[in-house]
A protein has these predicted regions:
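Catalytic machinery of carbohydrate-active enzymes
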Residues: 1-328
Length: 328
């Protein structure tokens, strides 16, 4: 039997974590460990992964086979497959690959010619031991106040009001996240963590590696975030997750754990739940056809504010309910 190689053509944290259900399924299909090829910066996501034989960067993979005839190699010596191919590109029939309209866990599987069942959609991360030496209390909340596209960024004012609420109620709060630059088709987004006042807790943004971030989330009573890479990482932990509302339909990103989307998870929607980023009727409105992705970053109803965002009142009421009922 030939060795199997899966090459993952994405770099962002969340999109890459969404590959792990496909990797796990291929492992069980072949009943052996799989070779995986990823960008160098993504290797951290697969540390300790028990389904991987050898983990290669693109450069390491090319170096390994540089003296081989490629066509002979993939026809006779190895099985080679790629996932996350050609976002926004039309296929031979003219149909655009619209990743905004597909669960990313299924994108990776679909590229290999199959679909994952609901009970196969959970993601994996296998961290190193917790190395952080910071003394943390037993009970704490983690928040991820990162910037993103405007329709996926809760305002600085809202985050500050949330921090004020948590501080007033003596809830130790840890800020996490990382400054990154994400490049997608026609969109470049700088993601960074704002600074806040009146924090009863610690700001650990840009201070933790991925394994330590996993442990930070796994040991937290509660994690609060919008749709983000850390949402997918949190989906590999046992923490309680509050996902804040945005223009993206949560059904494309909410974690599967324990066979359900509802395990230790609440989505707090805003007044508007049209989810225009993923709603294909806006493709018709913008382009006159469903065969294009609508603009991704703004409000496609042209409202003066993002009504899809959670209200601070709904968020604080939810936290109060969870704590008063000993759910977290």
């Amino acid at each position: 039997m030939r060795d199997v190689y899966l090459s993952v053509n994405c770099k962002t944290l969340g999109d890459t974590i969404c590959f792990t259900p496909t990797l796990r399924k291929v492992f069980y299909i072949y009943n052996k460990k799989i070779n995986v090829v990823v960008p160098e910066e993504s290797k951290r996501i697969f540390v300790n992964n028990p389904y991987i034989d050898v983990l290669y960067s693109y450069e390491e993979f090319h170096e390994k086979f540089k003296n081989k005839d490629w066509n002979h190699l993939i026809s006779n010596e190895i099985e080679y497959y790629q996932t996350y191919l050609f976002p926004g590109v039309k296929n031979q029939l003219g149909i655009e690959r619209k990743f905004q309209h597909v669960d990313l866990r299924q994108v990776h599987a679909n590229d290999l010619g199959f679909q994952l069942f609901d009970d196969e959609l959970y993601c994996d991360f296998f961290p190193n031991n917790f190395s952080n030496s910071i003394d943390l209390p037993k009970d704490y909340v983690v928040i991820h106040p990162s910037t993103n596209w405007p329709n996926r960024t809760w305002s600085h004012e809202s985050w500050q009001l949330l921090i004020n609420f948590l501080s007033k109620n003596n809830i130790f709060t840890i800020i996490t996240g990382k400054t990154t630059v994400q490049k997608e088709k026609n969109v470049t987004t700088e993601k960074y963590i704002n600074k806040f006042e009146n924090l009863y807790g610690l700001d650990l943004s840009d201070n933790l590696d991925l394994s330590d971030t996993y442990h930070l989330l796994n040991n937290a009573k509660l994690f609060i975030t919008l749709d983000s890479g850390l949402l997918h990482l949190a989906g590999t932990t046992d923490t309680f997750i509050i996902q804040l509302g945005s223009a993206k339909d949560p059904r494309f990103s909410s974690p599967y754990r324990k066979g359900t989307r509802n395990y230790k998870y609440i989505y707090i929607k805003g007044k508007c739940d049209l989810f225009c980023t993923n709603n294909m009727k806006y493709s018709i409105k913008e382009w006159g056809t469903m065969n294009n992705v609508p603009p991704l970053t703004g409000c496609l109803e042209n409202k003066p504010t993002f009504e899809c965002h959670s209200s601070i009142k709904d968020v604080t009421n939810t936290i109060t309910y969870l704590t008063n009922n000993n759910i977290v």
